[in-house]
Amino acid sequence: MKKFNIMAVLLLFSISVLAIVPPDNVQATFKKMYPKTNDIAWSQDDGYYCANFVMNGFTKNVWFNAQGQWEMTQTDLVSLDRLTPVVYNAFTFSSYASWVAEDVTMVEFPKWQAIIVIEVGQDNVDIKYQLFYTPKGILLNPLTVSEKSPQKAKNQTEG
């Protein structure tokens, strides 16, 4: 029993040591933006602090720089039916409408318009695209994000 208690204490200690605690300025900016949010999981990626939480049924990732300035918010929309009618109609009337929507995310920025990103693929095909839509339903340049995209394959054979 003592061995189990010691193991549990060590596990809890290791988790608390690995937990990210952002600087006060980052936490202050976050609290101004989301004053009623609880259960926040903080992480750090390439110098940015990211608050991960659920709000109104949506998973959100809010990114801040080390100076405490908001950089972007990613909201996982889960499926196409959570899109605005304008973006939904733009997608359903596009040449990608028959493709499978694998991920739907809205990305908001402090100084730019929001972008809706729909990742699509096809059954039994390795090519995937990220489709970037404006809130007005305008499709921007699609981006190939496949593991075996032609550009990646070309780069691998040249290297």
Region annotations inferred by a language model:
Residues I20-G159:
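Interaction-mediating elements
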